[in-house]
Amino acid sequence: MLGRMASAQDLLILALCGLLLELPAGYHATDTRQPRLRLSHKELWDLNRTSVFHSPFGYLGLHIMLLDEYQERLFVGGRDLLYSLSLDRISNNYREIHWPSTPLQAEECIIKGRDADECANYVRVLHRYNRTHLLACGTGAFDPVCTFIRVGHPSEDHLFQLESHKFERGRGRCPFDPTSSFTSILIGGELFTGLYSDYWGRDAAVFRTMNRMAHLRTEPDSEHLLKEPKFVGSYMIPDNEDHDDNKVYLFFTEKALEAETSTHAIYTRVGRVCVNDMGGQRIVVNKWSTFLKTRLVCSVPGRNGIDTHFDELEDVFLLQTRDNKNPVIFGLFSTTSNIFRGYAICVYHMAIVRAAFNGPYAHKEGPEYYWALYEGKVPYPRPGSCASKVNGGLYTTTKDYPDEAVHFARSHPLMYQPIKPVHKRPILVKTDGKYNLKQIAVDRVEAEDGQYDVLFIGTDNGIVLKVITIYNQETESMEEVILEELQVFKVPIPILSMEISSKRQQLYIGTESVIAQVKFHQCDMYGTACADCCLARDPYCAWDGISCSRYYPTGMQAKRRFRRQDVRHGNAAQQCFGQQFIGEVLEKTEERLVYGIEYNSTLLEYTPRTLQAKVNWFVQRAHETKKEEVKTDERIIKMDLGLLFLKLHRLDAGTYFCQTVEHSIVHTVRKITLEIVEEERVDEMFSKDYEEEISHKMPCPMQSNIPQVSKPWYKEFLQLIGYSNFQRVEEYCEKVWCTDKKRKKLKMSPSKWKYANPQEKRQDQEKKARIRPEHYRLPRNIADS
């Protein structure tokens, strides 16, 4: 194979690529910061691992997705539309509802100064109301409206009908603006929302509306309660078996009044209200009497006690456990700095959250004072607590609370103690600028060596990262292992929403214009050897003695007793002992012969199947038995694509061995013999008269009428470099030449090579200006082969 001879521009590009693609400093034998597998949209599609849904109207305007395992449907709310999609395959058997703004709503909206897009009806609320109905609310051209959708029972052939006779005003239930931040949760027929409740987007509040209980909200124009919040998520998490003690937790960011060093500091908050709050009797009438909040911290400990904070909450995910009172909270955060951009994921346990809300209150004596711990007497019942038996049972409703307790909660909504993450640090940090992380979903998996939380992280360019993190107690550090990088969509597009089904092992991903589903795993993609499977460290996968396949814990469809898996350490040598895994790989070592022209560039190509492996290059010179590691410099550059020689020297000739290293497992994956062709011999070859042979090119089998040339030009070239197996090379070159002829009839016409001989060109200089040809250039197919 001939190394392609590049122009000066090509050399410059390759050199720049080499500098950019060099391995970073401190690169270890296994770089788990790189994805083990990187799968394109086409590869996912070819593997039948994904399915996509496009709206037949050409647009979707996605704002919300609701995964309903009972109905076995994914409900989607967008612009003027609702969809019901099958969880098994979202592209099949879908139902749709067209729900636009009324002409009157749209007309009034435009008169008020909004554009036509804003005056559509964007569905922002979708909740399962009961077994047969959904609650849906839309922006209604800046005039929110709510209704019910009949979905029936799963046996009713996927019923999906809008009940238009039940329209209700949606103020306090749905935002006016389709782009404003919003969160909602439906509990016992009561809708709890965090939103901006007015036309101009100035009145931020937490509401409870809908059913038998009194409508409540936070007090308007109270910056100590909410100051320009961005609502992210909300969940009902019980504290105990007493349902009267249930609380709703709201996650949001806001400008922090207690930040003494900056008036524009942004903090992430956890707010809390009692589900059965009825407000006060004489003060805070129809207002929350139990609203409290505290800071949610996600930071990297630094030297001298100065931490790096990630204060902007992007997304939050609640991982349910067997104990519904103690789910695990995952927060995806970003920095608020205009200089430094980074992302982090922190994990919180409910015990830490409850301890913060049961701790001391924050207090400020006056404008000239700093925020401090409140050390005075706390009234009874404890401000912010619910009217329940757990609280003593003396009060059946918050309306009966003493004015002192209600007033204290009203004036002291902020807790002094922040909520800090597990291990006092993030489980994952991204500061390389490669990804902008936006969404998170988590699945808990039982593996051979323990329990792991698999993170699925959505980015702003349509990529999903599949990651696990492992905590090292000895070093108090986290190891992040990126298992897969999945290009879910054909073109880069921000991921707006993700829903996860552990039951089906499927991830549902929403963007503004398209929805996709992706299977959690495809174990056979890691490789066909035991070592490949164990080195992957995917808790879903294990070596079963024959292939890399889905791992099932003992007693759960365990088909084979032979299971090899080591997620924590990836110790393939120990797990695969006796499997002859090294021999299997070495037998597959690919051998190649590459010819390069002296003083030109050549790339010895190899792209490792896994990006986590360290790639080493060794060379064995002619007539030598010793191998030595290739030393890189400004002329020889190690790239992700292989080993690049910017300018070949005669001494570069030899046999090159490409090795990958992972967890002490060394694979020799490619053996390349590099032959150097002296520049003088190439000049001699091109100085001969080959016009007739080149103009006719190679005789193709289907074109017997073309005169056969006695000696194609490449044969003499092979004689110059000393290659003797003419028959094999001739068959290959005929195949390349004739394939190229069929594919590029116009581009490869005889006129293209008319002036390949410099002597002929000099004879023709009387007719046209003399232009020296690129006499080193060869047919591209041969150069690239």
UniProtKB/Swiss-Prot annotation:
Protein's GO biological process: angiogenesis; axon guidance; negative chemotaxis; neural crest cell migration; positive regulation of cell migration; semaphorin-plexin signaling pathway
Tell me the segments the record calls region Disordered. Answer: 744-785
**Sequence ranges assigned to domain Ig-like C2-type in this UniProt record:** 651-740
Q: Which domain of life is it from?
A: Eukaryota
SS bonds (residue pairs):
109-119, 137-146, 274-386, 298-346, 523-541, 658-733
Q: Which GO terms describe its cellular component?
A: extracellular space; plasma membrane
Q: Where is the composition biased (Basic and acidic residues)?
A: 759-777
- Keyword Membrane recorded: no
Q: Where in the cell is it found?
A: Secreted
Q: What does this protein do?
A: Plays an important role in signaling via the cell surface receptor PLXND1. Mediates reorganization of the actin cytoskeleton, leading to the retraction of cell projections. Promotes focal adhesion disassembly and inhibits adhesion of endothelial cells to the extracellular matrix. Regulates angiogenesis. Can down-regulate sprouting angiogenesis. Required for normal vascular patterning during embryogenesis. Induces the collapse and paralysis of neuronal growth cones. Plays an important role in ensuring the specificity of synapse formation.
- What family is this? Belongs to the semaphorin family.
- PANTHER family assigned to the protein according to its UniProt record, in alphabetical order: SEMAPHORIN (PTHR11036), SEMAPHORIN-3E (PTHR11036:SF22)
- Name of protein: Semaphorin-3E
